[in-house]
Amino acid sequence: MIIVADSGSTKTSWALLREAQEPLLFNTEGYNPYYVDAAYIQKSIIANFSHKIESDSVKHIYFYGAGCAGGKDQIVKDALMNVFPNASIVIESDLLAAAKSLLGDAEGFISILGTGTNTGIYEDGKIINQVNSLGFWLGDEGSGAYLGKKILAQFARRAMPIELMDAFEAEYGLTPSTVVPAFYDAELQNRYSAKFTVFLHHHIEHIFIRNLVKKAFIDFFENLVCLYPNYRSYSLNSIGSIGIIFAEQLKEVALTYGMRVGKINKSPIEGLITYHQQGF
């Protein structure tokens, strides 16, 4: 059996590939090693896999994950090794998963717009150039967590139109005085922030919200797209829920920067299944 996984900070999509059978697909929480440790990942995987398969039957695991760089990949690998002792394990970045899924063997610009953000240039099966997204605290412009921080700040400062202030308070039970403590008390603040994109989606027709979302994508372009030489020669290809939910605003901003829009998909898992089924 082969396991293929694509993990963001909020959700991991799993595919169990068995010869002559349909893939078994399911989701768990995300496992970004910048925010959770090996023990946390191991416990969660055991809880989610215990009734699905025999762990000893897994021979190969291909895990593509957010945060799996700079030595952090070993955290995920240690967790997987403890659960699946007979498996050979390959850990790659979520950006490479997006590239394989959307571009196949073609070269191009690839991005992730989910809870976090990532960008790169893909060529010959590898990411050959990558601007550091800097993560939740310092960067991740355009991501769900980034958008969430922006709307939380506007609410806390009472800088939103009164009708949006009232709607936000009614939906979440927060006030400008309680929203900041709630944010800092959250166990995983990137996930906590990202959940407020639902409010943005529900109110996207309001000019204040539309401008907030577009400004976040302008920040994305200025910090994570325009730093690539000749970026206008590529099309914008993106994986992630934020690119899907706010596709109209993303396309508007891309056009102002002279960049064509290519493929925008929610998840790379289907493309990864096709890629790795070649091993059967």
Describe every region a protein language model picked out.
Residues 1-61, 79, 102-109, 150-280:
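ATP-binding/phosphotransfer module of carbohydrate and carboxylate kinases, centering on a glycine-rich
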Residues 62-69:
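Polybasic, low-complexity association/targeting segments
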Residues 69-163:
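Phosphate-binding/catalytic loop of phosphoryl-transfer enzymes
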Residues 66, 94, 241:
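Cofactor-binding loop segments of dinucleotide-utilizing enzymes, especially the Rossmann-like FAD-
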